[in-house]
Amino acid sequence: MDVIVSGRHCHVSDDVRSQVEDRLLAVDKIRDRVTRAEVVFTAQNVKGSPDQAMTCEITLRSRGPVVRAEGHAEDKMVAFDKAADRLRRRSAALTNWVR
């Protein structure tokens, strides 16, 4: 499985990139079925807040359906965790399709 981690309007450090890759590759259910995983972090300025809001979008591509989930938080890894939780719930669609 290819894992692509990128950022829009923000820098993704090597530490964050390696943590994301390790967590996605550790999921045995999807590792064999998914051909490509794309993780995009997007920084968004929020009016009245000195911090930037982060959005993490995870897209899993396979021969069948494309499964996508999004998470929002002020921290990259928290946003990734929220998106990964939503992805776990949606991965049933991918599992059922392969059967």
Where are these regions (language model features)?
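N-terminal, polar/charged subdomain of small-to-medium soluble alpha/beta proteins
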Residues: 1-99
